[in-house]
Protein backbone atom coordinates (compact mmCIF):
# COMPACT_ATOMS: atom_id res chain seq x y z
CA UNK A 1 0.00 0.00 0.00
CA UNK A 2 3.00 2.30 0.43
CA UNK A 3 3.57 2.12 -3.34
CA UNK A 4 -0.02 3.25 -3.92
CA UNK A 5 0.34 6.04 -1.38
CA UNK A 6 3.53 7.26 -3.03
CA UNK A 7 2.14 7.18 -6.58
CA UNK A 8 -1.39 8.38 -5.88
CA UNK A 9 -1.01 10.73 -2.91
CA UNK A 10 2.54 12.02 -2.56
CA UNK A 11 2.72 12.59 -6.31
CA UNK A 12 0.02 15.24 -6.06
CA UNK A 13 0.35 16.23 -2.39
CA UNK A 14 4.02 15.93 -1.44
CA UNK A 15 3.46 17.45 2.01
CA UNK A 16 0.71 14.99 2.97
CA UNK A 17 0.51 13.59 6.49
CA UNK A 18 -0.26 9.87 6.71
CA UNK A 19 -2.54 8.55 9.46
CA UNK A 20 -2.22 4.76 9.63
CA UNK A 21 -5.26 2.74 10.73
CA UNK A 22 -4.34 -0.73 9.39
CA UNK A 23 -3.32 -3.51 11.77
CA UNK A 24 -0.87 -4.52 13.06
CA UNK A 25 -0.92 -0.81 13.85
CA UNK A 26 2.56 -0.16 15.21
CA UNK A 27 4.31 -2.31 12.62
CA UNK A 28 2.32 -0.82 9.72
CA UNK A 29 3.23 2.67 10.96
CA UNK A 30 6.89 1.62 11.11
CA UNK A 31 6.68 0.06 7.63
CA UNK A 32 5.15 3.27 6.27
CA UNK A 33 7.90 5.39 7.79
CA UNK A 34 10.71 3.20 6.48
CA UNK A 35 9.17 2.69 3.03
CA UNK A 36 8.02 6.21 2.25
CA UNK A 37 11.00 8.12 3.60
CA UNK A 38 8.81 10.90 4.99
CA UNK A 39 9.82 12.93 8.06
CA UNK A 40 8.75 11.11 11.22
CA UNK A 41 6.34 13.89 12.20
CA UNK A 42 4.20 13.08 9.15
CA UNK A 43 3.61 9.36 9.87
CA UNK A 44 1.09 8.73 12.65
CA UNK A 45 -0.62 5.55 13.83
CA UNK A 46 -3.97 6.13 15.50
CA UNK A 47 -3.99 3.01 17.75
CA UNK A 48 -3.51 4.74 21.10
CA UNK A 49 -6.34 7.13 20.27
CA UNK A 50 -8.81 4.27 19.88
CA UNK A 51 -7.54 2.37 22.92
CA UNK A 52 -7.79 5.50 25.07
CA UNK A 53 -11.37 6.12 23.91
CA UNK A 54 -12.31 2.58 24.95
CA UNK A 55 -10.53 3.06 28.29
CA UNK A 56 -12.52 6.25 28.94
CA UNK A 57 -15.75 4.44 28.04
CA UNK A 58 -15.14 1.61 30.50
CA UNK A 59 -14.12 4.12 33.18
CA UNK A 60 -17.32 6.08 32.61
CA UNK A 61 -19.38 2.91 32.92
CA UNK A 62 -17.74 2.10 36.24
CA UNK A 63 -18.24 5.65 37.49
CA UNK A 64 -21.77 6.06 36.11
CA UNK A 65 -20.92 9.23 34.20
CA UNK A 66 -20.47 10.52 30.66
CA UNK A 67 -17.26 9.42 28.92
CA UNK A 68 -16.56 13.06 28.04
CA UNK A 69 -16.15 13.79 31.76
CA UNK A 70 -13.31 11.30 32.10
CA UNK A 71 -9.66 11.72 31.16
CA UNK A 72 -7.68 8.56 30.55
CA UNK A 73 -4.74 7.46 28.46
CA UNK A 74 -3.41 4.22 26.99
CA UNK A 75 0.19 3.92 25.85
CA UNK A 76 2.24 1.06 24.42
CA UNK A 77 1.46 -1.24 21.53
CA UNK A 78 -1.97 -1.44 19.91
CA UNK A 79 -2.75 -5.01 20.93
CA UNK A 80 -4.55 -6.98 23.62
CA UNK A 81 -1.35 -7.87 25.46
CA UNK A 82 0.79 -4.84 24.63
CA UNK A 83 -1.39 -1.84 25.52
CA UNK A 84 -0.91 -0.12 28.88
CA UNK A 85 -3.96 1.71 30.28
CA UNK A 86 -2.59 4.27 32.76
CA UNK A 87 -5.20 3.95 35.49
CA UNK A 88 -2.97 5.90 37.87
CA UNK A 89 -3.36 9.05 35.77
CA UNK A 90 -7.08 8.74 34.95
CA UNK A 91 -9.31 11.51 36.31
CA UNK A 92 -12.99 12.37 36.64
CA UNK A 93 -13.67 16.11 36.83
CA UNK A 94 -10.14 16.64 38.07
CA UNK A 95 -10.28 13.93 40.72
CA UNK A 96 -8.05 10.85 40.47
CA UNK A 97 -10.21 7.90 39.49
CA UNK A 98 -8.14 5.79 41.88
CA UNK A 99 -9.77 7.71 44.75
CA UNK A 100 -13.26 6.98 43.42
CA UNK A 101 -12.99 3.32 42.41
CA UNK A 102 -11.55 0.38 44.29
CA UNK A 103 -8.32 -1.20 43.10
CA UNK A 104 -10.30 -4.30 42.11
CA UNK A 105 -12.74 -2.25 40.02
CA UNK A 106 -9.90 -0.40 38.32
CA UNK A 107 -8.28 -3.72 37.48
CA UNK A 108 -11.58 -4.81 35.89
CA UNK A 109 -11.68 -1.61 33.81
CA UNK A 110 -8.10 -2.15 32.64
CA UNK A 111 -8.85 -5.78 31.72
CA UNK A 112 -12.00 -4.78 29.81
CA UNK A 113 -10.04 -2.13 27.91
CA UNK A 114 -7.34 -4.58 26.88
CA UNK A 115 -9.82 -7.08 25.41
CA UNK A 116 -12.28 -4.45 24.16
CA UNK A 117 -11.31 -4.75 20.51
CA UNK A 118 -11.32 -8.54 20.52
CA UNK A 119 -14.67 -8.62 22.34
CA UNK A 120 -16.22 -6.30 19.78
CA UNK A 121 -14.84 -8.34 16.88
CA UNK A 122 -16.30 -11.51 18.39
CA UNK A 123 -19.72 -9.91 18.84
CA UNK A 124 -19.76 -8.35 15.37
CA UNK A 125 -18.29 -11.34 13.59
CA UNK A 126 -15.97 -8.92 11.81
CA UNK A 127 -13.47 -6.17 12.54
CA UNK A 128 -14.63 -2.90 14.10
CA UNK A 129 -15.20 -0.04 11.69
CA UNK A 130 -16.98 2.87 13.37
CA UNK A 131 -14.65 3.34 16.37
CA UNK A 132 -11.41 3.17 14.31
CA UNK A 133 -12.93 5.62 11.83
CA UNK A 134 -13.97 7.99 14.61
CA UNK A 135 -10.53 7.77 16.22
CA UNK A 136 -8.87 8.49 12.88
CA UNK A 137 -11.15 11.48 12.34
CA UNK A 138 -10.27 12.79 15.82
CA UNK A 139 -6.58 12.67 14.91
CA UNK A 140 -7.15 14.34 11.53
CA UNK A 141 -9.29 17.07 13.11
CA UNK A 142 -6.47 18.07 15.45
CA UNK A 143 -4.08 18.25 12.50
CA UNK A 144 -6.16 20.17 9.96
CA UNK A 145 -7.45 22.66 12.55
CA UNK A 146 -4.05 22.94 14.28
CA UNK A 147 -5.73 22.20 17.61
CA UNK A 148 -2.54 21.03 19.33
CA UNK A 149 -4.43 18.30 21.19
CA UNK A 150 -2.58 15.85 23.42
CA UNK A 151 -3.41 12.47 21.88
CA UNK A 152 -1.77 9.05 22.34
CA UNK A 153 -0.58 7.88 18.92
CA UNK A 154 1.86 5.37 17.49
CA UNK A 155 4.93 7.38 16.52
CA UNK A 156 8.62 6.79 15.81
CA UNK A 157 10.83 6.93 18.88
CA UNK A 158 14.50 7.87 18.95
CA UNK A 159 15.36 7.47 22.61
CA UNK A 160 12.11 8.72 24.12
CA UNK A 161 10.84 6.43 26.88
CA UNK A 162 14.11 4.54 26.59
CA UNK A 163 13.20 3.05 23.20
CA UNK A 164 14.45 3.54 19.64
CA UNK A 165 13.78 2.41 16.07
CA UNK A 166 10.12 1.49 16.46
CA UNK A 167 6.68 3.05 16.33
CA UNK A 168 4.62 2.66 19.50
CA UNK A 169 1.86 4.52 21.32
CA UNK A 170 2.89 7.54 23.40
CA UNK A 171 1.24 10.92 24.06
CA UNK A 172 1.95 13.53 21.39
CA UNK A 173 0.83 17.04 20.51
CA UNK A 174 -0.87 17.02 17.09
CA UNK A 175 -1.07 20.15 14.96
CA UNK A 176 -0.72 21.40 11.40
CA UNK A 177 2.72 19.81 11.06
CA UNK A 178 1.52 16.43 12.26
CA UNK A 179 3.47 15.45 15.36
CA UNK A 180 4.42 18.75 16.95
CA UNK A 181 5.95 17.19 20.06
CA UNK A 182 6.38 13.83 21.77
CA UNK A 183 5.39 14.27 25.41
CA UNK A 184 7.38 12.20 27.90
CA UNK A 185 5.38 11.59 31.06
CA UNK A 186 6.99 10.19 34.19
CA UNK A 187 6.25 6.48 34.47
CA UNK A 188 6.47 4.32 37.56
CA UNK A 189 8.92 1.42 37.65
CA UNK A 190 6.06 -1.00 36.92
CA UNK A 191 4.81 1.10 33.99
CA UNK A 192 8.35 1.34 32.59
CA UNK A 193 8.69 -2.43 32.75
CA UNK A 194 5.37 -2.91 30.97
CA UNK A 195 6.34 -0.37 28.31
CA UNK A 196 9.67 -2.12 27.73
CA UNK A 197 7.86 -5.47 27.36
CA UNK A 198 5.38 -3.89 24.95
CA UNK A 199 8.21 -2.43 22.87
CA UNK A 200 9.94 -5.81 22.80
CA UNK A 201 6.78 -7.39 21.34
CA UNK A 202 6.52 -4.67 18.68
CA UNK A 203 10.19 -5.13 17.78
CA UNK A 204 9.51 -8.85 17.33
CA UNK A 205 6.70 -8.17 14.85
CA UNK A 206 8.90 -5.69 12.99
CA UNK A 207 11.64 -8.33 12.82
CA UNK A 208 9.23 -10.72 11.10
CA UNK A 209 8.73 -8.14 8.33
CA UNK A 210 12.47 -7.76 7.94
CA UNK A 211 12.87 -11.52 7.63
CA UNK A 212 10.53 -11.64 4.63
CA UNK A 213 12.16 -8.62 3.01
CA UNK A 214 9.30 -6.17 3.56
CA UNK A 215 11.68 -3.80 5.34
What annotation goes with each model-predicted range?
Residues 32:
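Conserved nucleotide-sugar donor-interacting segment of glycosyltransferase catalytic cores
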Residues 6, 29, 56:
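Generic structural marker for isolated residues within well-ordered, non-membrane alpha-helices
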Residues 20-29, 47-51:
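Gly/Ser/Thr-rich loops at beta-strand to alpha-helix junctions
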Amino acid sequence: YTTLFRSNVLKYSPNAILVVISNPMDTMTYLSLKSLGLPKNRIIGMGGTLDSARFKYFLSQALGCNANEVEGMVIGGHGDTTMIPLARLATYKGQPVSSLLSAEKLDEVVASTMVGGATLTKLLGTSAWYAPGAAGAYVVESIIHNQKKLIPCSVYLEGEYGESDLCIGVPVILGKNGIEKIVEIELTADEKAKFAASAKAVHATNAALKEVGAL
